[in-house]
Amino acid sequence: MLLEPIITSLLETDMYKFSMGQCIYHQFSDYKTTWSFKCRNTDVHFTHEMVEEIKEQIKAYCGLRFTEEELEYLHKIKWMKGSYVDFLRLWQPRYEDYEITEDAECGLTIETFGTWLNTSLYEIPTLAIVNEVYFRMAYDYDDLLASFEKKLDEKITLLKNSTYNLGLFSEFGLRRRLSAGAQELAVKKLNENKYPGSTFVGTSNVFLAKKYGITPVGTMAHEWIMCVGQGNHKHNPAYSNWYALDWWVKEYGILNGTALTDAITTDCFLRDFQLTYATLFSGVRHDSGDPFEWGEKMIRHSESLGIDPKTKTLLFSDSLDFERADKIASYFAGRVKIAFGIGTYISNDTDVPALNIVMKTTKCNGMDVAKISDTPGKGMCKNPEYVEYLQRCISWRMENDR
């Protein structure tokens, strides 16, 4: 291993991996999933040396275990149950679940195979490893870090002088961060400063949330809706949201209540997000499509159900920077609660372009699963026939299910 270990704690993942993980443990522990890595940058190539370093870093990650101090921290989270904490006490990543080759056009193929309970937890650390190895080995890292620090200080100044007023915002950048050190620096500086029109709430990185005594932020991801709704082959996949919301409420009741809307289009989501769920959930998250149109749609939906939109939160997390977040916050001011999850712009803004890398669920229980979001091209299913089938199911429901 050429570099120091990149992942040094099993807490170094996004919070929603634990909230989903607890549901998976209690309700879907026998589900099997396949996850596939993709680099969307067309001009990026991973060298043989990079791939070998990625393998060694993942092996080091697979040697980690939760400490009792970390487990105690998790157990104090109000929705975390002792049975899941006891499972995590025994849990360890398995390198045997990984298949890493150089077959892809970008020079790096990664797939993981195993229980959903295990493979779900691999996604975020794997992406963080790939990202940091690439930037440390492809560029002069010290120069990148210097440009990162300069841009970070400029961003903080823009918040302090009220050029941008975001209201509530959190850092969501673990998976595509420049490095562990860069992300920690960003979280530390954002947390220690005060802003007239913005409040830094926390981070999705549970390790950093614990270290700095701030809120670990996150509820559910697309994988939850895709696997719960499409992993049982007796289900009509156009009702994926209903199944996912139903099982979530069975686990958490009114806790952990931010629903993701765009796994199989927001319009289809709203067919299932009726009075019971719209009342129980504290808000919804935007991750694709036009944020202004989406926000208006959410407000109209709440009003149609007799719910005051001002009692609900719209969480925006799609490709945000401070300027875009400021415009959204200003547009919806006084009409609904607003919050932001901001990722790469905080954790990897340097003088070179960031990587656009993802790792997505591509199979569940031996069958294809897919996301059809509000932005074309964000899905990653390997079987176009399944995507066509899913789209037909959604279209039929939207046209016929009144």
Give the residues covered by each predicted segment.
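Glycine-rich phosphate/ribose-binding loops and adjacent secondary-structure elements
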Residues: L2-L3, Y212-R402
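Ordered alpha/beta subdomains of enzyme catalytic regions
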Residues: M1-A238, V358-R402
